[in-house]
């Protein structure tokens, strides 16, 4: 082949650039790089899994056609994530197919496989008021298994981070104690394996598998409700591990006392250690989660778009991140830049219809005061220190922009100030907005807070 892989990929990109819109090309191809080429395959590095999936599903045929046109050969395109190794044909075995698994051998010779998502670590977990205690408890357990809280019971709604914390515990333990036998399993899979073990007359093997571990992580324990035989088996598994100072971590969508048809003896054991909950994230945490997601996936998302999404989706982290992905995908398919307007279009079909509230000066005062850590009375008082005067000017500017109130009326709401004071504040902020990008971000964030209530 005459071209080396850099030349070949560069020519391919030029070809694709002619076929695609500028936003689509910049979104999906600008961060790609060739890393290896054989007689049949060209391996391309991509920044994140979302890009990999998108290129595979949407552009693979176009890329391979362009490659053939340029090189004269039918090359297959293969995308690699950062750190992902090229799979050779002779290495086609189970461990290669499932790189996320970590295998350990017990003294009885049975294989322990821990299924941990490499993305779910303490480093990627965003801490906020709604999950701070659960995070601290999980880290304490990871640092000192069976010494801090045993069992650790984490409960909360769907998509709030319970599974993330459980995987993070597993990763932390294995990174500090590589010889530990760590098993993560859902209660549904535990039940299915138990049923199969009874059917195949392999209950001894089943018990050896789960009673000879150092860390047992059981997700969604509420699904054991009503399954008497499985509860009986788990009861004895729990006892064996606890008596041998082995750590047990359990998650559920509700606390033990609210799980229906759960045997009292199991319920009481779940309450032996520490019970902690995770609530829905507040606005600040939702913004932080989206920023972290964008950073980890190497996505350039404008701040006002992140704030908008965080304001609109307040249910759980899974839907929040799903909203971000939807905006990215929509902007690419519609050949539009990622802006707040694009985000509004992308999310309009999945967001509940909200009747816009009539904006009031009082609502603006409360929101601005909260944003700057002040009291509403501070905005109405005669204080002229910058820490108060600047937020007051912003509040007056927004009151003039977003309400139907007259200048004298706005002045009255701010401690009986003259209408010329309101006019001066409005003009000053309007002028500063043309020069200071940071002020634009501040105003956008406050507007999003105002419309998000």
From Swiss-Prot:
Any GO BP: DNA replication initiation
Pfam family, one: Bac_DnaA
SMART domains: AAA, Bac_DnaA_C
GO function terms (MF aspect): ATP binding; ATP hydrolysis activity; DNA replication origin binding; lipid binding
Residue ranges, annotated region (Disordered): 87-112
GO cellular component: cytoplasm; plasma membrane
Stretches for region Domain II: 75-114
Domain notes: Domain I is involved in oligomerization and binding regulators, domain II is flexibile and of varying length in different bacteria, domain III forms the AAA+ region, while domain IV binds dsDNA.
Family: Belongs to the DnaA family.
Name this protein carries in UniProt: Chromosomal replication initiator protein DnaA
Organism: Natranaerobius thermophilus (strain ATCC BAA-1301 / DSM 18059 / JW/NM-WN-LF)
Name of the encoding gene: dnaA
